[in-house]
Amino acid sequence: MSEQESLRCSSARNRGGVQRVEGKLRASVEKGDYYEAHQMYRTLYFRYMSQAKHAEARELMYNGALLFFSYNQQNSAADLSMLVLEVLEKSKGKVEDEILECLVKLFSLMDQNSPERVAFVSRALKWSTGGSGKLGHPRLHQLLALTLWKEQNYSESXYHFLHSSDGEGCAQMLVEYSASRGFHSEVDMFVAQAVLQFLCLKNKNGASVVXSTYTEKHPSIEKGPPFVQPLLNFIWFLLLAVDGGKLTVFTVLCEQYKPSLKRDPMYNEYLDRIGQLFFGVPPKQSPSYGGLLGNLLNSLMGSGEEDDMAEEAQEDSSPIELD
C-alpha cells in the first residue's frame, strides 16, 4: 500500500471513529442529557488535542455546537464554538473560505445580545490575522457584514463592510438602511459618512464603489452627477480631488461646501485625516476617544499602530460603528 493510500485509509478510519462518537453524543443530547453530553464533548476535545488530532477536534466541536444550537442550548453551543477557535489558534490553521464560513455560521446562531457572541467575533477576527493585532481578514468581515445585514443590524454591518473589500455590498446595505430607518432629508448623509470613513482607511476604491453604487441604486436620489443634494456633489468632487492630490483643490472644496459639512460635526474630523493622507496636510493634535466608538474613531484618525493599518486597508478588517 502506498503512503498516500495509507493516509487515505487512516483518514477514513478517523472519520469513521468520529462518526461513531458523534452518534453516541447525539443520542445523549436527544435524551435531554445536555450537561453530560457537553462534558463528554469537552473530554473528547482534550483527548484529541493531546494526540494532535486537530481536524477531528475541530469537526467534532463544530458539529457539537450546531447540535446544541438546534436544541437551543446556547451556553453549551457557545462553549464548543470557542473550542473550535481554540483548535484553529493552537494548530495555526490556515485562513480558508470554508473555515471562515463555518465560523460565521456559528456566529449567526448565537444569541444576538450575548456577551459570548462579542467575545467569539473578537477572537475570530484576531485569529484571522494570525494574532498580529491587525483589524481582521476582509473576507471574514464581509461574511459578518452580510450576516448582520440579514439581522437588520445595520450599524454593525456597516462597521464590518468598512473593513471588507465589498464596497458594492456596503452600498446596497446602506440603501436599505436609509430607506427603512432614515429620514428622507438624510439620504445623502448615509453614503457621505461611508465614503469619508473608507477614505480615512485609505481605501479609495471602496470609497468610490460605495458612492457610485449608492447613488445609482437609491430610489430617492435623482440621476447624477451633478446631484440635487449639495453633500453628494461634495463627495463626488472629493473623490476626484483625491485622485489629483492637489491641496488647493481640496481646500477650496471644503470651503465651498462648508454649510453642508456642518450637518455632522464628524465630517471635519474625517476631512482632517483625509487631508493628511492624500494632500500632505500636517496632522493636528488629535483628541483621545474612549469605548467602541473611540476605537473606531482612533483607527480612522490613525492613532497609534492603526496608522500603519490604513496603508493596508484593503487587506485588513475589524468591526466599526459610527452613526
UniProtKB/Swiss-Prot annotation:
Its main location: cytoplasm. GO terms for biological process: tail-anchored membrane protein insertion into ER membrane. It comes from the Eukaryota. It is found in: Cytoplasm, Cytosol. Keywords: Cytoplasm, Transport. The keyword NAD does not apply. One of its GO terms (cellular component) is BAT3 complex. Residues 304-315 have a biased composition (Acidic residues). Residues 303-323 are annotated as: Disordered. Component of the bag6/bat3 complex. Belongs to the GET4 family. As part of a cytosolic protein quality control complex, the bag6/bat3 complex, maintains misfolded and hydrophobic patches-containing proteins in a soluble state and participates in their proper delivery to the endoplasmic reticulum or alternatively can promote their sorting to the proteasome where they undergo degradation. The bag6/bat3 complex is involved in the post-translational delivery of tail-anchored/type II transmembrane proteins to the endoplasmic reticulum membrane. This is Golgi to ER traffic protein 4 homolog.
